[in-house]
Amino acid sequence: MLTSSIFLPSDCTAQALADFEKLVIEGGAVNPQGLAQRIRKASRLLFVWASDDQLVGVGALKHPRAGYRNKVFADARATVPADEYLVELGWVVVTKSHQGRRLSTRIVGELLPFAKNENIFATTRADERVMSFATDYGFKLNGKAYPSGHGYDLVLYLRNAARFPDAM
């Protein structure tokens, strides 16, 4: 049985924050430089544990800096302005031992109510089915794939809160 909890970063122990960071780094899609600080600035952190208290999944809602948002939207050649999407869904990582169980879908579904009235963006590798569940939650691909700088391309997904006023 899996259990999940959502916390403000300020309510997490140092060990919980370190475990979150470790799993995100193991996921391999994030620059680890400054990650601990970015985790502490997130608006919500979600943790999923297996029955043996092993951390098997994480996710977050973030309010990234305008410079980062603007770069993502420009790189993706987004068709809408970055300042309309202030919340980022990210750091959705599931351990290899628990992949294929739709745990990412659960993580996203549990986080979205904390940003139900907000437009949300997310990025993921273009070559993965990471956001295959995106349409379940109203995310739509926007713009074009762009280089990540780490040897793979990224794509931008957007969720417009106005389209789903009663979804949460």
Feature-to-residue mapping (PLM):
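Short amphipathic alpha-helix that is part of the acyltransferase structural core
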Residues: M1-Q37, L45-V56
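Short hydrophobic/aromatic beta-strand element in the GNAT-like acyltransferase core
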Residues: S43-V48, V58, W91, L154-L156
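Conserved acetyl-CoA-binding loop-helix of GNAT-fold acetyltransferases
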Residues: G90-V94, Q99-P113, D136
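C-terminal "cap" of GNAT-fold acetyltransferases
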Residues: D127, P147-M168
